[in-house]
Amino acid sequence: MEVNILGLTATALFIIIPTSFLLILYVKTASNEA
């Protein structure tokens, strides 16, 4: 099975972007409550 760099990058971005977005949102909420 050949590793598709473009597909791998797209998958990584698809996972990382929402995760980082939720993480930032959580940090903002936590700092507001503190």
UniProtKB/Swiss-Prot annotation:
Q: Which GO terms describe its cellular component?
A: chloroplast thylakoid membrane; photosystem II
Residue stretches spanning the membrane: 5-25
A biological process from GO: photosynthesis, light reaction
Record's keyword terms, sorted: Chloroplast, Membrane, Photosynthesis, Photosystem II, Plastid, Reaction center, Thylakoid, Transmembrane, Transmembrane helix
Name where it's found: Plastid, Chloroplast thylakoid membrane
Record-linked SUPFAM superfamilies: Photosystem II reaction center protein M, PsbM
Q: What is the predominant subcellular site recorded for this chain?
A: plastid
What membrane topology is annotated for this entry? Single-pass membrane protein
Determine the domain of life of the protein's source: Eukaryota
Q: Which residues form the signal peptide?
A: none
Q: Which family does it belong to?
A: Belongs to the PsbM family.
Q: What does this protein do?
A: One of the components of the core complex of photosystem II (PSII). PSII is a light-driven water:plastoquinone oxidoreductase that uses light energy to abstract electrons from H(2)O, generating O(2) and a proton gradient subsequently used for ATP formation. It consists of a core antenna complex that captures photons, and an electron transfer chain that converts photonic excitation into a charge separation. This subunit is found at the monomer-monomer interface.
Give the quaternary structure: PSII is composed of 1 copy each of membrane proteins PsbA, PsbB, PsbC, PsbD, PsbE, PsbF, PsbH, PsbI, PsbJ, PsbK, PsbL, PsbM, PsbT, PsbX, PsbY, PsbZ, Psb30/Ycf12, at least 3 peripheral proteins of the oxygen-evolving complex and a large number of cofactors. It forms dimeric complexes.
Name under which the protein is recorded: Photosystem II reaction center protein M
